[in-house]
Each structure stands twice: as structure tokens, then as C-alpha cells.
Amino acid sequence: MTTASDAVVVGGGPVGAFAAWNLSKLGVDVTVFEEHAEVGVPSHCAGHLSIRGLKTLGLDNLPRGIVENTYSGANVYSAQGTKFSLRMRKPVTCAVNRALFDKFLIERAKKTGASVSLNSRVKSLVVKNGFVVGVSLDQKSKGENQSEAKVVVDCEGISSRLVRQAEPAALSSQELVYGVEAEVENIENVVSDEVGVYLGKDYAPGFYAWLMPRHDGSAKVGLAATRGNPKELFQRFLSKHPVASKQLSKAKVTQMTFHAISLGGPIRKTCANGFLVVGDAASQVKPTTGGGVIFGLTCARIASEVVAEAVRRKDFSSVCLEQYEDSCRSSLGFDFRTMLRARRFIYSLSDKKIDSALRFSSRFKLDEAMKGVDEIDLQGQMLVKALSKPALFAGLAYFLLLYLTTNP
């Protein structure tokens, strides 16, 4: 059996759902294929999103129950337990229930005309005369078949199977960390509107651990690392970290998931004839924090506009679709490059140097200089603005001094 649409979206996660929603609003006949029986399950993301980012995307008035908490502060802890605290003037980030958030987006896509097919695993791209013209499917209710499309929008996530088929050289920039996230009850000594960030090569080498509290004493707790077994690192973090071990001494883990995160910045090529890749599959993920939802949604909106124009012009060549790549690079390229350099710099420092940096930041009251910050997604642009403040400029100079000195 063969079906046909203007566009096929592979993956019903937030990026795929948002792409389909925007495509259908622009009059494009679109079908979403989601391999799972239910959208949003299983969840592979903490759901820690910037409030400003959501507002920019028109998602600031989410239905009741999706937003689990908002955060006005953050505490960064070194491996030795030194704390640097930030307190903003208003909530800057929020925690969303990812299952409900994903369902909200897919329902909006359906209401604007998108078709959604669950239990539908896309096996491969269908290619004719150098153009992607559809997908080959394995559907639980219908067996194996194909769906024709003028454009395939790949939002399948980090597995990137289809990217390898369409543009095998595109993935060379991927840098992966491997993470674990848990739902935890009975946390202690935590302010409910402040997130925790925990550094240390014995607990999360090459990345960090996090704690996102809720008002009821539960939290999302996780970590990611470039090496080591995530589950073993997580147990060590719970029991040995000088701060987290006290906050989580009575904690009960009720659920645990494992996932990889791509931190190398966007892949080199995000389009081919009849094909676009968006979100985690394109590594459109913040290299500093591993957050990919806001950037993925931003790129999904750009992709939908480019695809709608391609449908109008009846031109599905890579030359036409490259407008998507150019627009994403123009909007986010500087921030990606800045964040990638910042991550490599920070994680090149020893635990002792990071501890010294946090002590310096507290001593020179860098928290006061950062109180007005509300932009956490476009971190390159945020850094440029920050350099106009003497205290933050001094802080950056100190970090550079740490990097250049040879003493551990």
C-alpha cells in the first residue's frame, strides 16, 4: 500500500510535531510517522526550557499541567562542594512534563490538518534519480509499505539513521556524551525554584550532573559523561558527591532512563534533494548544556517555511532547500560556535581550577552582575552583552588566566 503527501515528517517528538504544526498552518499536506504507540513516551529529556525561548516560539501560554515548575535561581557546585549561586529577578527557566508537552504539540498539528500515524517505523528513505521521494515503512497495523512525499523532514532524534543514508559524511562533527536521568522522590535541603548543577570528573567526566526540583519534594536528577558507565557514575554521584549525597540521602529513585546527547554542534550538511534534517538528528543541541528542544523547535519553524516555499515553487532540489541550512546558520551559528568553544574550555579545566573559579565568582559578586540575565539559549549573544559589564569582563579574564596557567 502506498500513500502520498506533500511532506513526510519522521518522528512525533516535539521537533517533529512542531514542524508538522507549522507546515499544516502554511497549507502543506503533511503526514507524521511515529514509531511508538504513544507520543512522548519514553521521554529522553529533562524538559528544562527557557521561558524566553518558549515565548519567542509562541509557546508561552501552555495548558495547565504541562509546566511542572519555574526557576529563578541556580546553584553550581564544584567537586569539592564549593557553591556559586545565581538568583535572577524573575523566573528564567521552567520544567515541563515532556510527555504532556509532546502530546500538546502533536494535537495542535492534528487540529491544523496534519495526519499522524503511530506504530509506524520508518525503515529507510526511498530514493529515485538522486531525489528522496518518500519513505519505506513498517507499520504495526498495515505491515510494510511506502509513503510518497515531495520532501522528507527527518526529526527522528539522535539515532540519525536516515541522515546516514541521505548524507553519510554529515555526521563527522558529532561528539557524544552518554546520560542517565531519574525521577526521584524525597529530596532534602533544596530550594524548590533553584536548579542544581554539579561538576566533577569523578561524577560526570566531560559534562555535569543536574537536579531539577519540584514543589512536592520530587525532582528530576541526572548526569551525562564522555566516559564511564552512566549508571555507575550516577550511583557514585548519589552517594559520594559532597553536596548531592546530603540532598539525596533519603531519595527514592522511581524511574530511570538512558540516552545519548550530541554536543558537537550542527552537522555539516542538513539537506539533500527532497530531504531536510532537524533537531537532535542534526545535532542542533546546545554544546554547553545539552539542551536541544528550543533550538530544535526554532529550526523546525525555519524548515517548515522553506518546505512550504519549495512546495509552492515545485522545487525540491538541495539548491532550493539550502535556504533552511543558511537561515539556521545565520540565526544560530555564532551561538553554536561560541558554546562549543566554551564547553571545550570549561571541561579542559581540572576540578581544582573549577573550584577556584567558583570561589572567585562568589568573591567578586558575579551573581549580582548576572541578575538581569534572561537569555540562556543564545549564549554567544549573551556573552557579548555580558562583556560590557566590568565585573563579568573581569570574570572572563580570570577564567582565561586559569586556562593559560599550567598548575593543576
Model-derived segments and spans:
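Beta1/beta-strand and adjacent pyrophosphate-binding region of the FAD-binding site
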Residues: 1-15
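Glycine-rich FAD pyrophosphate-binding loop
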Residues: 21-44
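Conserved Rossmann-like nucleotide-cofactor binding loop
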Residues: 15, 38, 159
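Predominantly flavin-linked oxidoreductase catalytic cores and closely associated redox partners
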Residues: 108-248, 283
